[in-house]
Amino acid sequence: MAEHYGQQQQTRAPHLQLQPRAQRVVKAATAVTAGGSLLVLSGLTLAGTVIALTIATPLLVIFSPVLVPAVITIFLLGAGFLASGGFGVAALSVLSWIYRYLTGKHPPGADQLESAKTKLASKAREMKDRAEQFSQQPVAGSQTS
């Protein structure tokens, strides 16, 4: 039973065993940066909504009939809170996915990420080889001494 569990753990997170610690730290820092920026965006949206409503509501009440600004205010309030909550949920979802990826729990889409990373690395190697090959070719019309 213990052997089966150990084999299962090894097959579940092979990308973590091959990665150096520095690369995992960089991934974690990137995850925190991405999630943190989404959380900050969520907070700024909430603050902007509250400030806009604070400024706009009295003006709408003074210069419009009573029902129109009430409907507009309720719409703006709802839209602002929904956007703020949506950004917060998105940030938490991203942080959760990245945490599961870094701990080797294989979240949905991890295979696609690994495949894209492999393709990108192979294309980068191919472009490097082409650049080296191109730099070694003699330029037409140049004189050789």
From Swiss-Prot:
Keyword flag ATP-binding: no
Pfam family, one: Oleosin
Motif range (Proline-knot): 58-69
Residues spanning the membrane: 36-56, 59-79
Name assigned to this protein: Oleosin L
InterPro entries associated with the record: Oleosin
N-terminal signal peptide: none
